[in-house]
């Protein structure tokens, strides 16, 4: 399991990568989709031949409640309509784990079901929390799924200054879905997935 000989430094490197994304200047992003409650932007990824997506919206709940629903655990399967299974393969200290999860087909199954094996880390960030992840090269594969790969991704959640009962949730996602999929289909799916994620989460809270 490459890269996990030193979990603490692996987690710190991942966290620092996400903080770097969080400081990218606004003029580097292009709007991919906008709804009443959520905006999704994108820019070319430096990790692979695809896009880094940024999503942002206000959620009417406390930071810890929101992140508890997002990070790996029993809450996530209850509300995330894209996720079809989630197993914790290994637990480490300091809010780190390895999880395997599967996603449903999308766009009338142009994008077939996917499987991911990710390292996940949740850590304090300013007055809030950051829950971040990255895929691992895991040998065991299931033939009924295409193995996707998440380059560094994560969710920053901080309380609003003027109303601490509301939180600003900002996500950074760069998923290589792999397989033979037109880029236009990937772009449509990613933008819709992110806006749906906020809708599902709001209903669950």
Curated annotation (Swiss-Prot):
One biological process term in Gene Ontology: cholesterol transport involved in cholesterol storage
Keyword Transcription regulation: no
Record keyword Nucleotide-binding present: no
Gene3D superfamilies the record matches: 3.30.530.20
GO CC aspect terms: cytoplasm; cytoplasmic vesicle; cytosol; endoplasmic reticulum
Alphabetized UniProt keyword annotations: Lipid transport, Lipid-binding, Transport
InterPro entries: StarD4, START-like_dom_sf, START_lipid-bd_dom
Pfam families: START
PROSITE patterns: START
Any GO molecular function: cholesterol transfer activity
Domain annotation START: ranges: 1-205
Domain of life: Eukaryota
Known catalytic reactions: cholesterol(in) = cholesterol(out)
Its biological purpose: Involved in the intracellular transport of cholesterol. Binds cholesterol or other sterols.
Protein name: StAR-related lipid transfer protein 4
Taxonomic classification: Eukaryota, Metazoa, Chordata, Craniata, Vertebrata
